[in-house]
């Protein structure tokens, strides 16, 4: 590449970064139109920016890099690691048996669990959730009894939290919990940006016979602000195959089953 071409490439990538910072995300289609370049060139730019940690590649584009300590809207999270979340959701749903009662925590990965359960058409299943988007997914599915946990609405996650939600959750027992987290640290356990969400998650853990954490590789080894609980309550982690061997082996040594998809 000539010095002039390199300069143009660097300037274009800086412009892409500015757009990501401004809008939260960019798409390949939009970048092709905006910069009058090929889709291949756009993908190369996004891959280069992702390789240095400046952005995170998403389906059809890239999004702003998220920090575990910050709380992001559901739509922003939905664009991240979508393929991995779909696979994780499928693997989690396949663990569920007819007649069970399960808890689905709020989150984009647990929403994928709900979508796969929807397609499975079980004859008898009870689902407890505090997430509006998950409730909408499952509300009219024959064979599914839906219990909605109410309380204080968190618009950023479309979920209910707070003392009322905790009190209601305390009234139930479940066979399995599927819990999505923002941080999964070997030393400090599970965590999330919001303290009220962390408190409700802790009640969910106590209410379930089996705790399954569903999260993609990007949350592993990270720590957020509000601690949910230690690792000793976790039966299983369902994640994608980009999780590091060091992390998964450390969990297995602690007696936690790891499913990688």
Residue ranges of model-derived segments:
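HTH-adjacent hinge/linker in prokaryotic transcriptional regulators
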Residues: 2-29, 33-106, 115-122, 126, ...
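Conserved phosphate- and dinucleotide-binding cores of soluble alpha/beta proteins
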Residues: 2-31, 36-39, 51, 84, ...
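A short acidic, amphipathic alpha-helical/loop segment
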Residues: 113-116, 250
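A residue-level structural signature of the nucleotidyltransferase/glycosyltransferase Rossmann-like core
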Residues: 126-127, 176
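Gly/Ser/Thr-rich loops at beta-strand to alpha-helix junctions
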Residues: 108-110
């Amino acid at each position: 590449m000539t010095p002039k071409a390199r300069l143009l490439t660097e300037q274009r990538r800086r412009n892409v970064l500015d757009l990501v910072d401004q809008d939260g995300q960019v798409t390949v289609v939009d970048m092709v139109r905006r910069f009058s370049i090929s889709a291949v060139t756009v993908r190369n730019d996004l891959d280069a920016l992702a390789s240095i940690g400046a952005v995170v590649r998403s389906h059809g584009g890239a999004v702003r890099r998220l920090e575990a300590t910050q709380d992001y809207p559901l739509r922003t999270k939905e664009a991240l690691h979508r393929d991995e979340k779909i696979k994780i959701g499928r693997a989690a749903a396949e663990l569920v048996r007819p007649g069970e009662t399960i808890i689905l925590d709020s989150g984009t990965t647990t929403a994928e669990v709900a979508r796969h359960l929807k397609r499975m058409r079980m004859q008898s299943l009870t689902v407890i959730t505090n997430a509006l988007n998950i409730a909408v997914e499952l509300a009219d599915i024959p064979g599914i009894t839906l219990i909605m946990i109410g309380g204080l609405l968190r618009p950023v996650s479309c979920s209910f939290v707070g003392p009322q939600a905790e009190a209601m959750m305390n009234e139930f027992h479940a066979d399995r919990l599927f819990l999505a987290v923002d941080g999964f640290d070997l030393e400090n356990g599970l965590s999330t940006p919001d303290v009220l969400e962390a408190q409700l998650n802790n009640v969910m853990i106590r209410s379930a016979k089996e705790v399954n954490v569903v999260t993609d590789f990007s949350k592993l080894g990270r720590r957020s602000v509000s601690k949910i609980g230690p690792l000793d309550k976790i039966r299983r982690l369902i994640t994608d195959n980009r999780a590091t061997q060091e992390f998964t082996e450390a969990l297995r040594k602690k007696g936690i089953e790891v499913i990688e998809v």
